[in-house]
Curated annotation (Swiss-Prot):
Major localization class: cytoplasm
Compartments it resides in: Cytoplasm, Cytoskeleton, Cilium axoneme; Cytoplasm, Cytoskeleton, Cilium basal body
Highest taxon in the source lineage: Eukaryota
The protein's name in its UniProt record: Cilia- and flagella-associated protein 206
Keywords assigned by UniProt, alphabetized: Cell projection, Cilium, Cilium biogenesis/degradation, Cytoplasm, Cytoskeleton
Alphabetized Pfam families for the sequence: FAP206
Family statement drawn from the similarity comment of this UniProt entry: Belongs to the CFAP206 family.
BP term (GO), one: sperm axoneme assembly
Region listing for Disordered, in residue ranges: 568-593
InterPro entries in the record: FAP206
């Protein structure tokens, strides 16, 4: 069957089921009906084949079963499914809610903004009308009073005129549409800051609620109410768990109590508890944000008072940023107020899905079932087995995580919302809290906790078997898919709010161990930049030199001695050490000079004549 045709068939089935329920006086939303259709098809006891196209008899059977389950107002399972659908359709995370809230405000202001930015006023009356529209826009965007209240309008107009006189409208009209929108937002922030400052000084603030005081009173009240509801839900869950524990050990009693739907009631109250914890976590975050913002508000107002004091004129560059920061802070107070209101209403509406407990289990019935039963809290059950610990030596192929060896131990995403998977599988649906101190089993990149060490050992022997049992149990009770977070195993029933997290990877454990490493003193060779200059004046001189070179001309001159010069290269063999040895040593002796002078004694003549006689032997004389 083509996808479009299949969708058409499903829509017709949902419409027919809704009409049947309406005929019996029960109004069921399309979302609840669609969820119930998938739940009935998943239940193997109904005999539907997921791989085969539905024929007419199958459709009639499906409609009949869905209508019967939707009209069974005494079934806690139906209340749990309705609760899950309601919470999924009405709850969003804090970030998503604030983002959507701001988007809605922008869309509502779009019409007023376009009336201002598209205006082509020229006459005096038209300009005055445009200025009034700007005042209304400022009031609507800031949320500080109604634009129909004369006192509030006068106060806002006076604040606006102090920063944006009507004479500047002509300049404003010459701006582009984008610049106009930006200036309108800036004017809103500044005017809001001025009005808040005047309110703090006792000179204005008409129509401005004391949001810090309102939040300071509303948050503790809401928190106390949720805490009390959470305590009641937990006490009820502990009582149901104690009775079911007793029933597990007594088969005869199990048959007697089967019509009471104890397990379905336990799932209902556990789901309610989980939703309350989610809402309470958001409210605690709100309380922390509000506490921080109250301190910031006091600091901003004090800074503004110090800047203004008794001065007649203050530079805009000094006070405008503070006005903007003050307005931004106040808008955050408004966001927190809306968020607290939504969460409070959500909590109140969740209580509507708990009506079956009073019908099925009045106090007299509960006291009879609790006879001889010890009611234990989740904390008590965990403390009873705190000393138990899985021995790693017993498991060579399984990986176990412990608090002292895992850095992000408390951030791991535990399967089945932290309930013991083994107990749930072998007792046909009993929910007992897992004790992480015993050890967390890591199997196929998923993490499992157990109520006792014996449960951990047995589950670890064949995890796939127990995982399959849990999946089959969830097919019979569709509310378990969201309660135990089995969305990856049933992708057709993933809540809309969790669709974006389907492909999100699980947090991987960061294991800790004692280890030592040694590195070289200098891993990389030293790099010294010879051309590096830290002095900016030296860099400036180099820049000027390079700039001057662009204006220079190169001249060449040749002389008689240089015109024949050219670049020359030569290649030589590298130096090497060499030595020689002669066969014999020889020497030679030169003749000794023998020079004589004759006639020194004189003679007969008066004049003496000396004669030099060289008798030195020749060199080559043998």
């Amino acid at each position: 069957m083509p996808p479009t045709q299949a969708e058409s068939v499903i829509k017709n089935i949902i419409r027919e089921i809704g009409q049947e329920c309406a005929a019996h006086g029960e109004i069921a939303s399309e979302t609840v009906v669609a969820f119930m259709v998938k739940a009935v098809v998943l239940d193997p006891s109904n005999g539907f084949n997921m791989d085969r196209t539905l024929i007419k008899t199958d459709v009639q059977k499906l409609v009949k079963l869905c209508v019967a389950r939707l009209l069974d107002n005494k079934n806690p399972s139906l209340d749990t499914i309705k609760m899950q659908v309601y919470f999924d359709m009405n709850y969003t995370s804090r970030e998503d809610f604030l983002e959507e809230h701001h988007r809605v405000l922008e869309s509502r202001l779009g019409i007023v903004s376009r009336e201002i930015t598209d205006n082509r006023a020229s006459a005096r009356e038209e300009l005055e009308n445009l200025y009034r529209k700007i005042v209304s826009y400022v009031l609507l965007r800031s949320g500080l009073g109604s634009p129909t209240d004369i006192k509030i309008v006068r106060e806002a107009t006076a604040a606006l005129q102090s920063v944006f006189p009507q004479a500047e409208l002509a300049t404003f009209l010459t701006l582009s549409k984008k610049d106009k929108e930006r200036q309108l937002k800036e004017l809103t922030m500044i005017v809001t800051g001025i009005r808040l400052f005047n309110r703090d000084c006792g000179k204005g603030g008409e129509g401005i609620d004391d949001l810090p005081a309102i939040l300071h009173e509303a948050i503790p009240t809401t928190t106390q109410h949720i805490d009390s509801q959470l305590q009641i839900a937990q006490d009820q869950a502990f009582r149901y768990t104690a009775i079911l524990e007793k029933v597990t050990n007594n088969p005869l009693m199990a048959k007697e109590l089967q019509p009471y739907m104890l397990k379905e009631a336990l799932y209902n109250v556990r789901q309610y508890e989980i939703f309350l914890q989610t809402v309470l976590s958001d409210i605690i975050t709100c309380a922390e944000e509000v506490e921080m913002m109250i301190k910031q508000l006091a600091a901003q107002l004090e800074q503004l008072k110090m800047a203004v004091k008794s001065k007649t004129a203050v530079p805009t560059s000094q006070v405008f940023p503070i006005f903007v920061a003050l307005a931004s802070l106040w808008m955050s107070f408004q966001d927190e107020t809306v968020l607290i209101s939504v969460l409070s209403n959500l909590t109140t509406n969740l209580e509507l899905f708990l009506g079956t407990h009073e019908l099925l289990f009045p106090e007299k019935v509960m006291l009879g079932l609790l006879d001889g039963v010890v009611v234990k809290s989740d904390l008590t059950r965990i403390e009873e087995h705190m000393e138990e610990r899985v021995e790693l030596a017993d498991f060579r192929t399984q990986e176990w995580l412990f608090p002292e060896t895992t850095a992000n131990f408390n951030k791991l995403l535990i399967q089945y919302r932290g309930f013991c998977g083994y107990t749930f599988a072998v007792t046909d649906g009993l929910l007992l809290p897992g004790n992480p101190a015993i050890g967390i089993l890591k199997y196929k990149e998923k993490y499992y906790t157990f109520s006792t060490r014996d449960a951990a050992y047995t589950f670890a022997e064949n995890p796939d078997h127990y995982i399959h049992l849990i999946k089959e149990k969830a097919k019979k009770n569709a509310e378990l898919i969201q309660l135990l977070e089995l969305h990856q195993q049933f992708e057709t029933l993933i809540p809309y709010s969790q669709m974006r997290d389907v492909d999100k990877h699980y947090i991987k454990p960061i294991t800790k161990c004692d280890n030592g490493t040694q590195t070289d003193t200098h891993i990389l060779p030293p790099t010294t930049m010879r051309t590096y200059e830290w002095n900016e004046w030296e860099l400036r001189r180099k820049a000027i030199k390079l700039a001057n070179l662009r204006q220079k001309i190169t001249h060449s001159v040749q002389t008689d001695l240089s015109h024949m010069r050219r670049d020359n290269t030569s290649q030589v063999y590298p130096l090497k050490e060499a030595s020689t040895q002669s066969k014999r040593e020889g020497s030679s002796r030169v003749p000794r000079p023998q020079i004589f002078i004759a006639g020194l004694r004189g003679g007969q003549s008066k004049t003496t004549y000396g004669v030099k006689v060289n008798l030195t032997r020749a060199v080559d004389e043998t």
